[in-house]
């Protein structure tokens, strides 16, 4: 009888541990989603200049007279097996104090040397934004690059996360010491954002991607750290296909 009671108590204890662990996971997932929703609920912003009138999270890092700067970045990376990782993207710095935007378009080819160390070959093309149009600030002789800049759209302009709450059972990671956190979800090719990416980029795989929400800093909000979203289509040794995007609010360098 005593053995039976011990067995029952052991099962109950194990059940409680599993329940508490699962509950903590669900709680962290909800907090991570809530942290990202503050920014993702703004998507899509078709006219980027609307960000001049939008304020992000402010903390003690901001001067009281500083309206802050939005930093936008989107990039597509593709690596066929045995080849270099080819990356194309753009970063803009939107200063709300001066209502001016500058940044750069970049092209990179990353390949490991004989010792396995990654060697980059990044080229940057400075740009500015006027009347919601992105314009090179220096002459570009390469017509293809010039056209890519003129036609470039940030994910924030067409992405939509109204169904973020429907993403369930994600792989959750949280490290309170850094702090860092992430949530990963398996998507389908019918997902709205996946369709939008395939519409705009030549993605050489039919595999549906995983959506990764990752960040550092206080979950409740912080100007220190970052928040990124990533759509990972392929992740293998010497073979990768992913799209990453970020929209963060930081103190301005020139007040």
From Swiss-Prot:
Lipidated sites in chain (N-palmitoyl cysteine): 24
Main location: membrane
Cited InterPro entries: Csa, Csa_sf
This protein's record includes keyword Heme: no
Signal peptide range: 1-23
Keyword Signal: yes
Keywords: Cell membrane, Lipoprotein, Membrane, Palmitate, Signal
GO CC aspect terms: plasma membrane
Lipidated residues (S-diacylglycerol cysteine): 24
Membrane topology: Lipid-anchor
Top-rank taxon: Bacteria
Cellular compartment(s): Cell membrane
Family, similarity comment: Belongs to the staphylococcal tandem lipoprotein family.
Stated name of the protein: Uncharacterized lipoprotein SAOUHSC_00054
Taxonomic placement: Bacteria, Bacillati, Bacillota, Bacilli, Bacillales
